[in-house]
Amino acid sequence: VCGPSRKVGFMPQRDQLFEWRSIWSNVTLGLTVRGENTPQRQAHVRELLERYGLADFAQKRPSQLSGGMRQRCALIRTLAAQPKVLLLDEPFSALDYQTRLAVSADIYRIIRQEGKTALLVTHDISEAISMSDRVVVLSHRPAVVKSIHRLTQLQGVPPLQRRDHPAFAGYF
């Protein structure tokens, strides 16, 4: 990735929702700006809102949602454009544990089923191991690659099952 691209979706650590817009308007903003707010894309967004338990909040303002709900809105906004590459900066940081597990399983499924590539930035090593094919460990500033771990023993194992897999603890 060397610049803006329609094939890349970015989800920053903070939700970046506009307080004066409804949730629907926030999650479809990228589609509107790109001229892609078609009935098919809107149907996809409705499915995502339903999947993440936010369908009843589509006309609410961001200030009326919890931090976890806002983070799920940011994820929906990122997925709405159906990018091929996902850049996810601490995407689960505002989520409670149960929601974190459910959303991470969803992202894993989306990546696998739709053949997407994702770059996940996290400080949680168990989260990285649960979600990834490969973990790149960076040094503190300036970031330099310290090591790369290929998680071959966990290939194809979904995030929730990875945590119980005998190889999981060996990656720490």
Where are these regions (language model features)?
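Conserved ABC ATPase "signature" region
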Residues: 28, 32, 39-57, 109
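Conserved signature/switch motifs of ABC ATPase nucleotide-binding domains
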Residues: 60-63, 81
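Catalytic Walker B motif of ABC-type/P-loop ATPase nucleotide-binding domains
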Residues: 86-89
